[in-house]
């Protein structure tokens, strides 16, 4: 159960970083 709880935040963090990289990459 703990592993599932840790995987969700990591996934959300990855999406945020991915979107953030695109926003910063675009002028």
Swiss-Prot record:
One of its GO terms (biological process) is proteolysis. Glycosylated. Its EC number is 3.4.23.-. GO terms for molecular function: aspartic-type endopeptidase activity. The keyword Glycoprotein applies. Belongs to the peptidase A1 family. This is Pregnancy-associated glycoprotein 62. It comes from Capra hircus (Goat). The lineage of its organism: Eukaryota, Metazoa, Chordata, Craniata, Vertebrata. The gene is PAG62.
């Amino acid at each position: 159960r703990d592993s599932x709880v840790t995987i969700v935040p990591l996934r959300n963090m990855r999406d945020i970083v991915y979107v953030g990289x695109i926003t910063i990459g675009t002028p």
